[in-house]
Amino acid sequence: MKKIGIALTLVLWGLEVTHAQNGGQLKQAQVSTARQTPQQITDQYLASQKSLTQRKVALSQALEHELAQGQNTNASNVYNITCVQLVPILTAMRVNDEQLLGFLQSMNPNQSNNGVKASLRENQALESKTLNNCKQLKSLL
């Protein structure tokens, strides 16, 4: 295992979406990894991604439920679910992938890390598409 000379701090985005009257609040948690093994860092990343994925699925289900209302769909609710709550989670997932990829490449520059790269591309595309949808939705409100 390759040693890194300087202490590495990897920012894993642990998100807590608190449902308050203002529609939600996003908190970012930093995790210092200076005294952790590469496996512990990777495990933290995976746990964070799992939590974010669960939140993404829950919000996607809420969005599907809202859209199933047909003509009774509330555009404001769709905007709140998609643009206020879901976009920050998608951004956090992308940042997690970027941070993990950087960490893994610093540990072993010759490793391909194709799985992380594929996840990063997928999360970038989903975030971009969702942001574009939010711009269109906002113009309708």
State what each model feature region is.
Residues 21-78, 135-141:
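Immediate post-signal-peptide N-terminus of mature secreted/exported proteins
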Residues 9-10, 62-63, 124:
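Enrichment for repetitive, rod-forming helical segments
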Residues 4-13:
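Sec-dependent N-terminal signal peptides
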Residues 14, 130-132:
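A generic structural signal for ordered secondary structure
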Residues 76-130:
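Long, amphipathic, charge-rich alpha-helical segments that form helical bundles/coiled-coils
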Residues 15-20:
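Sec/Tat signal peptide C-region and signal peptidase I cleavage site
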